[in-house]
Amino acid sequence: MADEDCQNLTVDDIVALIDEAYKTLYNNRAICPTMATTLTFMAKTNEGMLLAHLGDSRIYQIRKGEGVVFQTKDHSLVNDLLDSGAIKPEEAKNHPQGNVITKCLFVTDDKDRYMAPTITLIRDIKPRDVFMLCTDGVYGLVSNDDMVEILTSDNALEERTKELVALCRNSHDNNTAYIIEIGGVDDDSTDKKENVTYTIGKPRRPIKRRICDFVRETLRFVKQNKHLE
């Protein structure tokens, strides 16, 4: 997908992308009919960073001097229990069902079963902000304090990545991450902009060919490029 296409992405486009991912899983069901996966997505648009996620893989936004300024909220049973008041925060830390997720991509051809992602537009972006998309095998081993210290250091991004690799070396879980550092922003005002979270329905409209091509290229890229493993 060309840069100008990403810049014009809309929330509906993201929903269409995820619908296409569901179709891709279904079309490859012969490989593993029970396969499922979490999802994180990020694209730089004219309005800011457009993020989407399903499950407990996370997106962090980290800023030097401020630490973690944004973090996605896991789609998990524990978070549902917290939100309902059924458990207290201290009970959530070591909850026996801490690894149970409530949303994911999975094999189905029933569009009514597609799970809606959480989509957030990050408008508060500063130069040198670091975004990290990662699985629970990373954040389960690396504390927020260590994450902030490493990713906001003055070392080259490659060196910071190697430091994270070292911390995840003994993980028995999937520990994949993609790290992006913001070089500059179009609007350098000091005014804080509010982020926007969207409530997603299930619009059904023809998906643009460029979006389909982008999904295929993304899946091919993920297969060929693995970080922090």
Model-inferred region functions:
Residues M1-E229:
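PP2C/PPM-type serine/threonine phosphatase catalytic domain
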